[in-house]
Amino acid sequence: MYTRNLLWLVSLVSAAPLYAADVPTNTPLAPQQVFRYNNHSDPGTLDPQKVEENTAAQIVLDLFEGLVWMDGEGQVQPAQAERWEIMDGGRRYIFHLRSGLQCSDGQPLTAEDFVLGWQRAVDPKTASPFAGYLAQAHINNAAAIVAGKADVTSLGVKATDDRTLEVTLEQPVPWFTTMLAWPTLFPVPHHVIAKHGDSWSKPENMVYNGAFVLDQWVVNEKITARKNPKYRDAQHTVLQQVEYLALDNSVTGYNRYRAGEVDLTWVPAQQIPAIEKSLPGELRIIPRLNSEYYNFNLEKPPFNDVRVRRALYLTVDRQLIARKVLGLRTPATTLTPPEVKGFSATTFDELQKPMSERVAMAKALLKQAGYDASHPLRFELFYNKYDLHEKTAIALSSEWKKWLGAQVTLRTMEWKTYLDARRAGDFMLSRQS
């Protein structure tokens, strides 16, 4: 299989392996099977239970593997589990692990590694950003454990032997197996955590069960991973190495692609016509299930006042941001993308009104909250460093100044420090997705 250079309008972050392939007989391979991917920024962590963003998930999906994976058609496929049974009307699942599973250090991977991973996810001490994910899956006692009302050992998951994992749900969840492909429900090596504790996720201590292992981490530059010979499907892992580059500017990514230094990168929608002419056949436009939004800090003025929050909500020109600023995006009125199977989006009548009416409503709300031309609304808009995020922030601040007279200060940080500040509540209005 040749490593082919591709440009993507958006990054496809899925639970599907990007490295496995069935190579036809006599197919010539490229001399070096190295894949260089623009991942935009350094991940906040590589601990599966602490992952909260796509930049980390993309790497963790290559370093670790769960019970199942999702193929390109969105279908659940066996991964660490070779098969499973569903019992008690969908309230109990029995997963049978493959024989001979190993961690990257050669130690056996067992059902207990899954139990530990899932217990870590709901343990308040872990502070997993996806702790609620297990409660949403209705795993027995997950919600109570997250709330601090039950012990982690009461979680509805147990190892009946080294190769058998039993999961008990509080109610049937038809899509439960699809949820297992997300890193929060990946296994972690109990023998490594027993030795290193919270320091297990430092690069020098980590042990993996996925197709690749961490080889090098140059902060804010790149992460390099190499093929894991202990991986269950190593014979089909064609790539020998993957490089995840922290290029936080789409133009830089594109220029390095043109220079042959990157194999896959994002490009701004505005550049598509020119790229289709200059690089025919190399551009892929792929839909992505993702919603970008801004999060209010409700514990700080002025956003502890619902009238202020509604005023900003009403005066966001979603069409402008989606079509003109970013391009090829769909204006969002809900957090859940409308393409999600079985989801019916709610129509909010007030967002269907002309902008002039929405502005009048917003101004009235701000006046009630004590803001006017002599006392304008002032706040800080916080986003992680990336050129498209900056364009969005500038557009929003300009719109709010034009419609409401708001004085908006822009603040940006590198991804890791941005996450730390957001977790600490050090923001007023912050970008999320």
Each predicted region: which residue ranges?
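Extracellular/periplasmic solute-recognition and catalytic clefts
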Residues: 215-226, 243-300, 323
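Short, well-ordered beta-strand elements
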Residues: 32-41, 92-94, 165-166, 210-213, ...
